[in-house]
């Protein structure tokens, strides 16, 4: 980590006395970066217009969900860190709150994606705040999408030889099925 950051080992150890502290800091930073990218997708000027069209709404949902998957080298590196944090939290209870935050972030992304699929721009903010969607069926659909995202997340990391485009295709097919119910 020190070499990658261009710091000496002593400098890193000054700021982070344990590996868990460093892992927790990195996880928080990645979470903030992902939230900023998602806010950029939602805040884009064309989202309001895009949701008016069925195919564009699907594209918005796809872009949101791709943030939770190892679809390129940057996302893969981030997802590997999250997986390490999740695995470590099984032995270190102090890390479990961060894993809970990660779970909430993926659920929030799923809620926003469902809001996009349903073309409900008024629900995007609700989903983004971590609140349940105002419709029970939509909230259940978000829970289902969350499960799909977790499965694709693990497949992408466990089977790195799998083409990221195949992950996208599986995600797109799942989103289309959810939309067309």
Give the location of each predicted region.
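Helix-turn-helix
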Residues: 1-25, 29
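Amphipathic alpha-helical segments used for helix-helix packing
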Residues: 60, 73-97
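Hydrophobic/aromatic residues within well-ordered alpha-helical segments
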Residues: 19, 26, 30, 34, ...
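Secondary-structure edge/capping motif, primarily at the C-terminal ends of alpha-helices
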Residues: 45, 89, 156-159
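Short alpha-helical scaffolding segments that buttress acidic/His motifs in well-ordered protein cores
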Residues: 64-68, 82-86, 145, 149-152
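Hydrophobic/aromatic-rich alpha-helical bundle segments in the mid-to-C-terminal region
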Residues: 95-100, 104, 117-181
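Hydrophobic alpha-helical connector segments
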Residues: 39-77, 127, 131-133, 142-145
């Amino acid at each position: 980590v020190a070499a990658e950051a261009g710091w000496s080992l002593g400098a890193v150890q000054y700021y982070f006395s344990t590996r868990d502290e460093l892992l927790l800091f990195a996880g928080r930073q990645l979470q903030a970066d992902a939230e900023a990218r998602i806010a950029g997708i939602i805040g884009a000027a064309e989202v309001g217009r895009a949701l008016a069209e069925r195919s564009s709404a699907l594209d918005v949902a796809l872009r949101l969900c791709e943030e939770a998957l190892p679809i390129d080298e940057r996302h893969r590196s981030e997802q590997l860190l999250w997986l390490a944090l999740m695995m470590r939290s099984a032995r270190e209870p102090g890390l479990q709150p961060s894993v809970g935050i990660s779970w909430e972030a993926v659920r929030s992304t799923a809620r926003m994606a469902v809001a996009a699929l349903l073309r409900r721009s008024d629900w995007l903010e609700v989903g983004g705040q971590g609140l349940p969607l105002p419709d029970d069926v939509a909230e259940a659909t978000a829970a289902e999408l969350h499960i799909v995202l977790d499965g694709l997340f693990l497949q992408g990391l466990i089977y790195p030889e799998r083409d990221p485009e195949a992950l996208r295709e599986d995600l797109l097919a799942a989103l289309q099925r959810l939309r067309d119910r």
